[in-house]
């Protein structure tokens, strides 16, 4: 992992150090912006599942507010026992990232290790908003 991406891993881990709660805040994400800034987001679980907010979505919102394109993404999951793992975005977050951070790379499982892949590779056949004639 490059030094800039390791910084993202550390930023996401710091969020979990400060805010982790089992079943409520288990994932943190950090995004590097083109201007060098790092924004973070935290998973916020709701009692009604669909109302929950993923860490990647929260961080992406912060990136949009910051006004600079996203270049790299790292997500970290903490298990109740304290172990932490890199985690790839869920399908909904992959859709959002495809719409708003398509030029970025995201860390995911690649074979037996982790590595950065282009966001469009997360969902190579994702839906597009434009209507297509049948």
Task: Give the location of each predicted region.
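C-terminal binding/interaction regions
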Residues: 1-22, 66-134
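Compact, glycine-rich, soluble single-domain proteins
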Residues: 42-57
């Amino acid at each position: 992992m490059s030094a800039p991406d390791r910084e993202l891993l550390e930023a996401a881990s710091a969020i979990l150090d400060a805010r982790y709660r089992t079943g409520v805040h288990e994932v943190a994400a950090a995004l590097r912006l083109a201007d060098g800034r790092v924004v973070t987001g935290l998973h916020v679980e709701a009692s009604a599942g669909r109302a929950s907010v993923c860490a990647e979505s929260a961080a992406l919102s912060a990136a949009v507010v910051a006004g600079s394109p996203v270049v790299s993404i790292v997500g970290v999951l903490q298990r109740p026992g304290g172990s932490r793992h890199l985690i790839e975005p869920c399908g909904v977050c992959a859709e959002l990232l495809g719409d708003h951070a398509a030029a970025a790379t995201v860390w995911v499982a690649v074979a037996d290790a982790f590595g950065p892949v282009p966001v469009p590779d997360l969902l190579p056949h994702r839906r597009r908003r434009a209507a297509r004639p049948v």
